[in-house]
Amino acid sequence: MARPGMERWRDRLALVTGASGGIGAAVARALVQQGLKVVGCARTVGNIEELAAECKSAGYPGTLIPYRCDLSNEEDILSMFSAIRSQHSGVDICINNAGLARPDTLLSGSTSGWKDMFNVNVLALSICTREAYQSMKERNVDDGHIININSMSGHRVLPLSVTHFYSATKYAVTALTEGLRQELREAQTHIRATCISPGVVETQFAFKLHDKDPEKAAATYEQMKCLKPEDVAEAVIYVLSTPAHIQIGDIQMRPTEQVT
């Protein structure tokens, strides 16, 4: 059953980046449940193909379309938007979810690790935002929505050295979202911009950050009742379901037991 306020999105197209697992997969599923066509992209699409089959067998009214895309490569991103334009008209909702962290500190981290984080967390998000807006503009879509999955690390810096460069990229997302909101107003459009900033979410994120210390990664999720990816997906649905005159800039959400 469609959530109140979500009826207007039925059969329209949403792009979800980083849809192969965690928050991205949960968001893609939630949108398909609400009757949207969802292009879910990632570098590998096996998990997205499985999720698409699950959604179909469950009888959800929407459709999940897997698309292989390396978001660190601008040509891949542009090719994806071109394919969406030719096959599905264009993007009405853009969920910039893809993000990564590398354990590269400011004093001794590798430049390649910093570039990996910057390329995906900042540049890919910005390229997808630009292309999504242009897709909406060329079709006279005036009610689109761009949602950036940010982080509480975009609002405070933890005393944890392996997160400091990552946090800088997320502060950039905070600034980019507000800058986007201002530019959309200057363009006199009703397209909205929102970022959602979760705290600790139980995904594979900590295991990738602490890839050489799986016990430390596991402890991240064992010390409290964490958010689930579905909690963040619920926030996405809430944002999309709000009336057109309401602009939600940022949702900050933590586990109740999270201190920082």
Curated annotation (Swiss-Prot):
It catalyses: a 3beta-hydroxysteroid + NADP(+) = a 3-oxosteroid + NADPH + H(+); 17beta-estradiol + NAD(+) = estrone + NADH + H(+); 17beta-estradiol + NADP(+) = estrone + NADPH + H(+). It comes from the Eukaryota. InterPro entries: NAD(P)-bd_dom_sf, Sc_DH/Rdtase_CS, SDR_fam. It is an enzyme of class 1 (oxidoreductase). Its EC number is 1.1.1.270, 1.1.1.62. GO terms for cellular component: extracellular region. Keywords: Lipid metabolism, NADP, Nucleotide-binding, Oxidoreductase, Secreted, Signal, Steroid metabolism. The keyword Lipid metabolism applies. GO terms for molecular function: 17-beta-hydroxysteroid dehydrogenase (NADP+) activity; 3-beta-hydroxysteroid 3-dehydrogenase (NADP+) activity; estradiol 17-beta-dehydrogenase [NAD(P)+] activity; nucleotide binding. Its main location: secreted. The active site is at Y166. Residues 1-30 form the signal peptide. Pathway: Steroid biosynthesis; estrogen biosynthesis. Homotetramer. Catalyzes the conversion of the 17-keto group of estrone, 4- and 5-androstenes and 5-alpha-androstanes into their 17-beta-hydroxyl metabolites and the conversion of the 3-keto group of 3-, 3,17- and 3,20- diketosteroids into their 3-hydroxyl metabolites. Exhibits reductive 3-beta-hydroxysteroid dehydrogenase activity toward 5-beta-androstanes, 5-beta-pregnanes, 4-pregnenes and bile acids. May also reduce endogenous and exogenous alpha-dicarbonyl compounds and xenobiotic alicyclic ketones. Belongs to the short-chain dehydrogenases/reductases (SDR) family. This is Dehydrogenase/reductase SDR family member 11. It comes from Homo sapiens.
